[in-house]
């Protein structure tokens, strides 16, 4: 008859918090305070649009008339976007805003023991600023 040895079993419970969980509040909404230039002439050449404001991030995107443009982050207060000649081919007014991408579906958790609230953070859009394309 074979004998069975009882080996102690150690159960290790590991609790891992994903990097996407953090304490606090969702990142602030970006805001635009100025565009430079603030206007252009229809039929003009491609140019760089400087967007000044607050709460810009490395992944912020400039939207030109609801279409994202190639955007360069220079600081939390300044972005530079490429506006093509096609973008200013016709006179009119376009809306410019900055969009901060969601942080990977981030969920922020706050509260004490037994009191927890969660907030799903989504992408944030700034105020819209008008850009004039003159005839």
Question: Which residues make up each language-model segment?
Answer:
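Short strand-edge motifs at loop-to-beta-strand transitions and within beta-strands
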Residues: 77-81
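Short, surface-exposed loop/turn segments at beta-strand-coil junctions that are enriched for proline
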Residues: 82-90
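Extracellular recognition modules
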Residues: 95-100
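Beta-strand/beta-sandwich contexts
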Residues: 23-64, 69, 91-93, 104-135
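Generic detector of short alpha-helix boundary/capping microenvironments
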Residues: 10-15, 28, 39, 84
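Short beta-strand segments within Ig-like beta-sandwich modules, predominantly Fibronectin type-III
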Residues: 70-75
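Sec-dependent bacterial lipoprotein signal peptides
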Residues: 1-22
């Amino acid at each position: 008859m074979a004998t069975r040895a009882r080996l102690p079993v150690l159960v290790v419970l590991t609790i891992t918090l994903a990097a996407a969980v953090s304490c606090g509040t969702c990142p602030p909404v970006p805001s635009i305070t100025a565009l430079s230039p603030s206007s252009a002439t229809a039929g003009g050449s491609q140019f760089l649009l400087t967007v000044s404001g607050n709460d810009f991030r490395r992944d912020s995107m400039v939207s030109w008339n609801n279409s994202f443009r190639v955007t360069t982050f220079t600081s939390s207060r300044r972005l530079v976007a490429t506006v093509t000649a096609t973008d200013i081919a016709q006179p009119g007014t376009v809306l410019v805003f900055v969009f901060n991408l969601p942080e990977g579906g981030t969920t922020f958790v706050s509260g004490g023991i037994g009191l927890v609230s969660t907030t799903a953070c989504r992408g944030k859009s700034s105020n819209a600023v008008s850009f004039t394309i003159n005839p």
